[in-house]
Amino acid sequence: MTMEMHATTIFAVQHQGQSAMCGDGQVTLGNSVVMKHKAKKVRTLYNGKVLAGFAGSVADAFTLFEKFETKLQSFNGNLTRASVELAQEWRSDKVLRKLEAMLIVMNKEHMYLVSGTGEVIEPDDGILAIGSGGNYALSAGRALVRYADNMSAADIARSALEVAGEICVFTNDQITLEVLE
């Protein structure tokens, strides 16, 4: 299954004891019409202890947020276990398998990319990005972590997404930023 992620960028970073995630607000119908400018694609879950962001179909993402939050509750906030269980259910369920979205989930200790093909990937460097502007944000974020160590995780996240928005036509500058201290 090939996933084409359009109309969004989600970026997450763990840096100097902080965890930050941000997403842009653009929702695009097809490749030509911007339907919404201020969508909120990053959320806090589990009493503010977990951040989650999605790229892909909005309806599919709401389904996945709900399923993921249920898994978090079932496993008492264990992010790793909830992520693995969601990926397994997503991959094996005939209806869920058709959902076209990807998630980044994180707490203070871990972050994962979770997909419908069963992947649960924890990055080596504490940085993840998904969506149409993901590669641009990832590149900018890695450079900032390496060479601007005076920046906070929140500043890195916002700056990386701003760079992506300058390059990717499916990413705008209406940024939602959430931070775990």
UniProtKB/Swiss-Prot annotation:
Source taxonomy: Bacteria, Bacillati, Bacillota, Bacilli, Bacillales
Residues the record lists as binding Na(+): G165, C168, T171
Major subcellular location class: cytoplasm
Functional note: Protease subunit of a proteasome-like degradation complex believed to be a general protein degrading machinery.
Cross-referenced HAMAP family: HslV
Record-given protein name: ATP-dependent protease subunit HslV
Similarity-based family: Belongs to the peptidase T1B family. HslV subfamily.
Activity control: Allosterically activated by HslU binding.
Keyword Cytoplasm: yes
GO molecular function: metal ion binding; threonine-type endopeptidase activity
Subunit annotation: A double ring-shaped homohexamer of HslV is capped on each side by a ring-shaped HslU homohexamer. The assembly of the HslU/HslV complex is dependent on binding of ATP.
Record-linked InterPro entries: ATP-dep_Prtase_HsIV_su (IPR022281), Ntn_hydrolases_N (IPR029055), Proteasome_sua/b (IPR001353), Proteasome_suB-type (IPR023333)
